[in-house]
Amino acid sequence: MALKMRFLYYSKKAKMKDLAEAIKKEFDLAQNYNAIDVIPPAYSCENERLVILALSGNDLDDMVRRFCRELDKKKAQNVALLIDGNDKVAQTALDVLKETGTNVIENVKMVKFGGLPFIGGKLSDDEKKDLLDWAHSVVDSIK
């Protein structure tokens, strides 16, 4: 049985959408039509085994902060962070998520996608491999 998992992102960068699609394909999430979505998602999380939050920016947006505050154990048992930004965003998101009582994966992935929103092309093969390896390590850590 496949892992009940979602990849939610807050970014306008093309590489983030590309990564979302790669995760969906790698973990065979096609049966779940809302497995990848933007924050806030069209359908709320419910009893997810893992939610990967991918955030871009140098500050945690208030809408994202509110969304994170709602991710309790009933909505997401485990949450992992992928940050395209600075340590401040990562630490703020970690602090907010830990307050909810959900298990926050300590292995936060920091990336620098760079480029302008909607421009920046696709993930390189090396970037894709690195990010998928990280995602597998997160999934393995909760099995």
What name fits each language-model region?
Residues 38-43:
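Short acidic active-site motifs
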Residues 3-6, 26-34, 46-143:
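FMN-binding flavodoxin-like domain, especially the glycine-rich phosphate-binding loop
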Residues 2-26:
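N-terminal beta1-alpha1 ligand-phosphate binding loop
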